[in-house]
Regions:
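Active-site cofactor/substrate anionic-group-binding motifs, chiefly glycine-
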Residues: 46, 51-92, 96-99
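A short helix->loop->beta-strand "cap" motif at the edges of active sites that frequently abuts
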Residues: 123
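Positively charged, low-complexity intrinsically disordered leader regions
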Residues: 1-60
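A glycine-rich helix N-cap at a beta->alpha junction
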Residues: 100-110
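Conserved small/polar residues in nucleotide/adenosyl-binding loops
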Residues: 131-133
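Glycine/small-residue-rich loop that forms an oxyanion/phosphate-binding "nest" at active or ligand-binding sites
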Residues: 126-127
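Active-site-adjacent beta->alpha loops and helix N-cap segments on the catalytic face
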Residues: 111-119
Length: 133
């Protein structure tokens, strides 16, 4: 699978070779995660964190990994203060957030929400929800 520019919405997208490829890349990146090596490969890139339900470890781990590779993180985990509260649709939110991000990680409790968001997004979306898309 060519992951470049692709949404990752479900484990069902992956076959065995895709999983092997992901583990290989993770192995290559390990020295950066334990700070034995430094890279700025993601310098200038922006990760949009979009969490519609509580998260500590997942939200922080994605942000930390992106930072360790030189990228910046835009937190949007305070959904209660977003325009969604005023009635903005998840589609409009996707269009706006994706214009300010290079990739978006998202957790949403409602089935179908991440898929709808990804369809409106201009950038890849990674589903971090515990439910199926």
């Amino acid at each position: 699978m060519d992951f470049n520019g692709s949404h990752i919405l479900s484990i069902d997208q992956f076959d065995r070779s895709d999983i092997d490829q992901l583990f290989s890349v993770a192995n290559d990146l390990e020295p950066y995660s334990i700070r034995k090596k430094i890279t700025r490969v993601l310098e200038g890139a922006i990760l949009g964190n979009m969490f519609f339900e509580p998260s500590t470890r997942t939200r922080i781990s994605f942000g930390a990994a992106f930072n360790m590779l030189g990228g910046a993180v835009r937190e949007t985990s305070q959904v209660g203060s977003s325009s969604l509260v005023k009635g903005e649709s998840i589609i409009d939110t996707a269009k706006v957030l994706s214009s300010y991000s290079d990739i978006i990680v998202m957790r949403h409790p409602d089935e179908g929400s991440v898929k709808s968001f990804s369809e409106a997004s201009r950038v890849p979306v990674i589903n971090l929800s515990l439910i199926h898309i």
